[in-house]
Each structure stands twice: as structure tokens, then as C-alpha cells.
Amino acid sequence: MIIYKDIFSNDELLSDAYDAKLVDDVIYEADCAMVNVGGDNIDIGANPSAEGGDDDVEEGAEMVNNVVHSFRLQQTAFDKKSFLTYIKGYMKAVKAKLQETNPEEVPKFEKGAQTYVKKVIGSFKDWEFFTGESMDPDAMVVMLNYREDGTTPFVAIWKHGIVEEKI
């Protein structure tokens, strides 16, 4: 298994269990799901309707995003202006790190990052933002949105802002 860790905070952000797809050469998007946690009935994959039950969330259980829950991501909030301020600083830090470690990737990163940030800004109200467990303000902010179907959530993490660790 491969764990994707933030290059600045070392927080675990995602794993290869979520089948991440590379977009614009700079961002990994991985579909995730809303799942029940808590309560005492763990019928993964069971069909409660066929068992005479119902599909409601059990008492003591809550619906959570599986990636957010598994990697203990912490929700944070931005308005457009504060997001742009954050992302400019973050991109500058990633670019500096790339120039040390992989300078030939810098032009690809700059072009792709600019394209993806425009996409985020264009639909800003639809995005949710999360920090890693350490809540490091200089680290990556994981972005969450929904696919065109409106029901499938996905997270987006910056390819050049992570290190892959095999476990």
C-alpha cells in the first residue's frame, strides 16, 4: 500500500486504496464515499431493506466522508480572497521545494496548477477544504467537491505537494 504524505507537515492525506487519477499533470483526484461510523451494527455491504431494516443512520452513528474520516482531516474555511492568498503562498513553497528536488517539473507544475486553481475559483462555492491532522497552516489543503452526478464526492491533492511512502 502507498500512503501519500504532505511534504511540509508529513500528515497522511490519502492512500492508493482510493484509486487516485492524475488531472492536469498536477493534481490527484480520488473518489470517496459517505459512510456510517459509530453505533454498534457494522453490516458492511448488507442490504438493510432486505433484512427488514431501514437505511437510516443508526442512533449513535454518523455519516462521514471515508477519506476525511480515515486520514483525520480537519475541516477549514476560506472565502475566495483568503483561499487565493493561501494558494499563492503554498504554490510558491511547493515551487521552491521542486526547484531543489526536481527542477524539470517546475514548468509543468506552474502551468497545471494555474489551470486547476482557475477551475476551483470558477466553482468556489461548491468546494470544501480540509487540513491534515496537524492543522499546519503552511501545509496542503485537501479540496473536496462532488462529481457531475452531484452525489459522488472526490478529494483533490497536489501531486507535487506529497511524498509517496510504501508500507
Swiss-Prot record:
Which keywords does the record carry?
Cytoplasm, Cytoskeleton, Microtubule, Mitochondrion, Phosphoprotein, Protein biosynthesis
Q: Which InterPro entries match?
A: Mss4-like_sf, Mss4/transl-control_tumour, TCTP, Translation_control_tumour_CS, Translational_control_tumour_p
GO annotation, biological process: cytoplasmic translation; negative regulation of autophagy; negative regulation of microtubule depolymerization
**Keyword Electron transport belongs to the record:** no
Q: Which GO terms describe its cellular component?
A: cytoplasm; cytoplasmic stress granule; cytosol; microtubule; mitochondrion
Where does this protein reside within or beyond the cell? Cytoplasm, Cytoskeleton; Mitochondrion
* SUPFAM superfamilies assigned: Mss4-like
Q: How does it assemble?
A: Interacts with the 40S and 60S ribosomal subunits. Interacts with microtubules.
Protein name, UniProt field: Translationally-controlled tumor protein homolog
Q: What species was this sequence derived from?
A: Saccharomyces cerevisiae (strain ATCC 204508 / S288c)
